[in-house]
A protein has these predicted regions:
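Structural motif
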Residues: 8-18, 56-65, 103-115, 160-173
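Repeated scaffold domains used in trafficking and secretory/extracellular systems
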Residues: 29-45, 78-90, 137-142
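Catalytic cores of extracellular degradative/oxidative enzymes
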Residues: 1-44, 147
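Residue position within the beta-strands of beta-propeller blades
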Residues: 1-8, 47-52, 95-99, 151-155
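Residue-level detector of high-confidence beta-strand sites
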Residues: 26, 126-129, 154
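Residue-level signal for WD-repeat beta-propeller blades
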Residues: 42-43, 56, 88-89, 107, ...
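Blade-level signature of beta-propeller repeat domains, shared across WD40, Kelch, NHL, RCC1
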Residues: 137-177
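Loop/turn-rich, solvent-exposed surfaces of beta-rich toroidal or solenoidal domains
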Residues: 46-132
Length: 177
């Protein structure tokens, strides 16, 4: 998957290629649909991109986009997602998503990390509050799961709003895992 500016006046578009460098499907021309994504395989065995949609009709929602044809499935019903990770290779079928936006227009997830089921059921496991006010890129939480999906690590200044410093690493363990 190549992501970038493929046409004048546009940014954050994606094009999928096979291993021989041949295009697969059409250019994903909508801005950031998805953005801040990670790649994985879903419950049907399809290669997908999982991330936040930065365009309508699913603005702010977590979506998955099938690489072979660009089909989109909305995975969450609310919030404005940020970073997504599917590095939980031993817990397939889930994406770990950081919600760092805390405005009144984006409930129900404010400044927290969640696990989102990839099957379209809109099942979300709430994991932890981030306590991570975003002051610049280095203070973004960017939560990432362990390979078994039982723990999540993220960056946080734990509420130091003015400077966002110092930034430390925090780990949460998922209950019952």
């Amino acid at each position: 998957v190549a992501n970038g500016k493929f046409s004048e006046g546009q940014g954050d578009q994606s094009q999928v290629y096979d291993l021989q460098g041949n295009r697969i499907g059409a250019l994903w021309s909508e801005y950031g649909r998805p953005s801040h994504f990670d790649l994985t395989i879903d419950e049907n065995g399809d290669d997908i991109a999982v991330g936040v949609s930065k365009s309508k009709p699913d603005l702010g929602r977590v979506i998955k986009r099938r690489l072979r044809d660009g089909a989109v499935t909305v995975l969450t019903s609310g919030g404005f997602a940020g970073h997504s990770s599917t590095r939980n290779l031993d817990r397939p079928g889930w994406a770990y998503v950081t919600y760092q936006y805390s405005g009144p227009d984006w409930p129900p997830f404010w400044n927290e990390v969640v696990a989102v089921k990839l099957d379209g059921s809109q099942i979300v496991e709430r994991i932890a509050h981030l306590h991570a006010p975003r002051t610049d890129y280095l203070t973004e939480a960017h939560a990432v799961p362990s390979p078994d999906g039982k723990r999540v690590i993220w960056a946080s200044s734990w509420g130091a709003k003015a400077s966002g410093r110092p930034v430390s690493a925090y780990v949460a363990r998922l209950k019952g895992r």
